[in-house]
């Protein structure tokens, strides 16, 4: 049976994309409505009476999601959608295309390692596999950090406190100078900020946190009392003194006191660091990219 391709209609197609997701992915990855809602562009494969596949596109340079219904797999549909999505992104001027993340928004950082067929799909089509990343979680209702978690930072004269309105300019200046790729996340103003300051009052580190009821695409999996911690950063001159661990531990305590249950930390390679702060690995991802002008 032949198939044809058409543009994604983000709103009109939302219902069947949810059905396709449920059919193509295992129960460990149930449909994520907020993730589906963020798909604003892409290509749809149709066969017979309706759609059977999707390649979402983020013109900023990523393919956030690609799915083919199990009944229509191994017919070249996924390969065709991927090639067309790459062509669309190259035509828009993308210097590099990444799988899953890399655009303005993302459902997951990379291709989930527990979706082995998805990992093979990109690996066998000329995509470059970089480092793996992981997400971690902690049950804050049972969170008991080590008694020494904040001692090293405290002995170095570091104090921790959530931001007030007067801190906003200083926080953004710190991010711009130290972690420029995070400026947009801190500038959004939709999450709380925890600051580590040295004895002179200068910012030595920051992180973002939100919960319970955090606005996260993974809420259907994490639960209604979910929280998130992200963008944990310590100034280079202060690294290695326990400040990062102190920040994560304190943010976790604040979230737990507010009623957060599962706290999620996404997109990191620092497994041992977060384990020391009381978190455990949850999901792992392979990071894939495709150079411009390469074969698909």
Predicted segment positions?
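Conserved acetyl-CoA-binding loop-helix of GNAT-fold acetyltransferases
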Residues: 74-91, 231-234, 240-253, 257, ...
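A short, internal acetyl-CoA/4′-phosphopantetheine-binding micro-motif in the GNAT/acyltransferase core
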Residues: 63-74, 102-105, 229-239
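Conserved hydrophobic beta-strand within the GNAT/NAT acetyltransferase core sheet
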Residues: 63, 97-99, 229, 262-266
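Acyl-donor-binding surface of acyltransferase catalytic domains
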Residues: 83-156, 288-290
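Short amphipathic alpha-helix that is part of the acyltransferase structural core
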Residues: 1-34, 51, 133, 147-182, ...
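A conserved beta-strand-loop-helix scaffold within acyl/acetyltransferase catalytic domains
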Residues: 24-42, 53-61, 179-234
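A structural microfeature
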Residues: 53, 131-134, 204-205, 283
């Amino acid at each position: 049976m032949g198939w044809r391709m058409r543009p994604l209609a983000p709103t009109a197609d939302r219902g069947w994309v949810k059905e396709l997701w449920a059919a193509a992915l295992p129960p460990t990855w149930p449909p994520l409505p907020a993730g589906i809602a963020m798909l604003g562009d892409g290509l749809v494969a149709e066969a017979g009476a309706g759609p059977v596949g999707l390649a979402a596109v983020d013109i900023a340079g990523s393919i956030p999601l690609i799915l083919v219904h199990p009944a229509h797999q191994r017919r070249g549909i996924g390969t065709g959608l991927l090639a067309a999505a790459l062509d669309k992104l190259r035509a828009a001027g993308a210097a590099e295309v990444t799988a899953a993340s890399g655009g303005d928004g993302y459902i997951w950082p990379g291709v989930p390692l527990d979706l082995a067929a998805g990992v093979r799909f990109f690996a066998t089509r000329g995509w470059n596999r970089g480092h793996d990343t992981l997400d971690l979680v902690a049950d804050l209702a049972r969170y008991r950090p080590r008694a020494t978690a904040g001692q090293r930072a405290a002995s170095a004269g570091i104090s921790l406190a959530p931001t007030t309105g007067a801190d906003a300019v200083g926080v953004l200046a710190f991010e711009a100078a130290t972690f420029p790729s995070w400026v947009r996340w801190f500038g959004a103003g939709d999450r709380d900020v925890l600051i580590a300051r040295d004895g002179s009052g200068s910012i030595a580190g920051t992180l973002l946190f939100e919960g319970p009821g955090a606005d996260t695409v993974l809420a259907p999996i994490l639960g209604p009392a979910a929280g998130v911690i992200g963008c944990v950063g310590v100034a280079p001159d202060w690294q290695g003194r326990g400040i990062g661990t102190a920040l994560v531990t304190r943010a976790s305590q604040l979230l737990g006191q507010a009623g957060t249950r599962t706290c999620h930390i996404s997109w990191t390679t620092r497994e041992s660091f977060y384990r020391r702060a009381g978190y455990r690995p949850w999901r792992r991802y392979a990071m894939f990219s495709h150079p411009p002008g390469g074969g698909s």
